[in-house]
Regions:
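Hydrophobic cores of alpha-helical transmembrane segments in multi-pass inner/ER membrane proteins
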Residues: 52-59, 115-128
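Physicochemical signature of membrane-embedded alpha-helices that form the seven-helix bundle of GPCRs
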Residues: 5, 9-12, 74, 111-118
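Individual transmembrane alpha-helices with interfacial aromatic-anchor signatures
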Residues: 44, 104-119
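Transmembrane helix-loop junctions and nearby membrane-interface residues
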Residues: 18-31, 60-67, 87-90, 124-134
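Interfacial loop at the N-terminal end of multi-pass membrane proteins
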Residues: 1-59, 91-103
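Helix-adjacent hinge/juxtasegments
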Residues: 50-74
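Mid-chain, well-packed structural core segment of small domains
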Residues: 67-102
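Alpha-helical transmembrane segments and their helix-start/interface "positive-inside/aromatic belt" motifs
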Residues: 3-9, 66-75, 129
């Protein structure tokens, strides 16, 4: 079980990203007025990034303790760092939106989208290739 825990964690990460990005965020923007959506999204996105960062760190620890699959050790730490960056720049995104700095908001928001997409891809690749190295 412990040997495959990083695989399970990557599966959870992929599920969280797909659920949040494909279902929750678009539904919020369509179903809730802009002011309430803003409050909710500012509440949920930092937690989203933090949960994935913690899961990635947990995966890294399990792999490091069991001392196997070095590639996935690096993948999990990259996943952790990318989500930590997203978490840390979220307040800057909110400040840019509040100060009507659309250019900065767009750049920072796009960076979180790209970093989250990279996190999705590397965790999906972990799922796809895990069996071939186990």
């Amino acid at each position: 079980m412990m040997k495959n825990l990083p695989l399970i964690i990557s599966s959870i990460i992929v599920g969280i990203i797909l659920f949040q990005s494909a279902l929750v965020a678009p539904a919020i923007n369509r179903l809730i007025n802009a002011e309430d959506a803003s409050v909710f999204l500012r509440y949920i996105w930092p937690k989203f990034f933090l949960i994935i960062a913690i899961l990635s760190l947990a995966s890294f620890v399990v792999i490091a303790i069991n001392s196997y699959q070095n590639l996935y050790k690096y993948v999990s730490i990259v996943s952790f760092v990318l989500m930590l960056i997203c978490y840390l720049i979220t307040p800057m995104i909110n400040d840019a939106k509040d100060s009507l700095n659309d250019q900065l908001w767009t750049a920072l928001h796009l960076s979180t989208i790209i970093l989250t997409f990279i996190t999705l891809i590397i965790n999906a690749l972990t799922i796809a290739y895990w069996k071939s190295v186990s």
